[in-house]
């Protein structure tokens, strides 16, 4: 037996990720060669800088989960070489063994490193910061043969501690109240978010469909937002909701919407990228859409609702009331849309002969059905929408969103 020590128990905001064995992946599509040995060394240094990444979860007698470190060395990166359409071997995630994994896939000479991390340790912002650090260290090693001394970081704090340290307390409203107006009111079709009766023992990849807009079309989307004084997040939210409304073919039923809000820059003092695991709040909106609804007006109402909830402190303390469920749907409520906009992703630092041309996200859950998650980002100037779903019509939903976005592009192209 190797000696182990408990770091801390998972907070309530983190427990749901342990219950569903949820790992998130961020893949980089690389042009140019990649040195596997240097990447391995960079990963080792990342683990040294963030010791909690070398830990695992253990379930306590009361059913709660604890982050535990031991003296076992992390197995390091996994290198997989493939040719043509050869399928990659399945990834095996076990949160009681490891919380982070780095796979370097080399297909016909093209490299794709993917960093996977347990969602209880990091949200997307936190994860991207780790990827930035990994690539920066890799670049130093490849170009100079050395790197700066390792700065060891403490284990990230849960959201609850971050809020308490900043005087954010539970208020009367949770934000869910506005969705109650649609609960047990409508004759609803079968839910796409219905959970499976039997779940896999280990996490499985949630299938994904996606679309990517060109740089030119992405610029027009941004120009449309500027011209109409809209946030990109609000416009993309409106596009997703209008697409969902069209696909559902239930025109008289509103579309409930929940989305995460990064609190790092909304709290005082601000929260650094890796200071907390998942420092987010949850925003809500009930989309009342009808034939002729204008996407800009819908986006403006989403934005106004968001600003009001932020001003009243509702979003900041929402997690003190509830934790959003990724699996299943509240009874009596139309299927909830979940959408995360990651904004404009900055370029990663790389050696001169290497470029990260694109990226994509992956979700792993130990569930067989019920996951419905939209995400978006702008990387290398191109807007990408991803739809992670167990449902049968992923491509249809993505095509409906792309249709909404191309209508915005056409609208902006006709200006002037």
Curated annotation (Swiss-Prot):
Enzyme Commission number(s): 2.3.1.282
GO biological process entries: lipid metabolic process
EC top class named in words: transferase
Superkingdom of this protein's organism: Bacteria
One term of GO molecular function: acyltransferase activity
Keywords: Acyltransferase, Lipid biosynthesis, Lipid metabolism, Transferase
Positions bearing the site annotation: Structural role in the organization of the active site: 123
InterPro entries in the record: CAT-like_dom_sf, PapA_C
Catalytic function, reaction form: 2 a mycocerosyl-[mycocerosic acid synthase] + a phthiocerol = a dimycocerosyl phthiocerol + 2 holo-[mycocerosic acid synthase]; 2 a mycocerosyl-[mycocerosic acid synthase] + a phthiodiolone = a dimycocerosyl phthiodiolone + 2 holo-[mycocerosic acid synthase]; 2 a mycocerosyl-[mycocerosic acid synthase] + a phenolphthiocerol = a dimycocerosyl phenolphthiocerol + 2 holo-[mycocerosic acid synthase]
Keyword Membrane: no
Keyword match NADP: no
Active site: 119
Family of this protein: Belongs to the acyltransferase PapA5 family.
Assembly behavior: Monomer. Interacts directly with the acyl carrier protein (ACP) domain of the mycocerosic acid synthase (mas) protein.
Annotated NCBIfam families: PRK09294.1-4
Record comment regarding domains: Consists of two structural domains that are related to each other.
Purpose: Catalyzes diesterification of phthiocerol, phthiodiolone, and phenolphthiocerol with mycocerosic acids, the final step in the phthiocerol, phthiodiolone and phenolphthiocerol dimycocerosate esters (PDIM) synthesis. Can directly transfer the mycocerosate bound to the mycocerosic acid synthase (mas) onto the substrate alcohols.
Name of this chain's protein: Phthiocerol/phthiodiolone dimycocerosyl transferase
Organism: Mycolicibacterium vanbaalenii (strain DSM 7251 / JCM 13017 / BCRC 16820 / KCTC 9966 / NRRL B-24157 / PYR-1)
Name of the gene: papA5
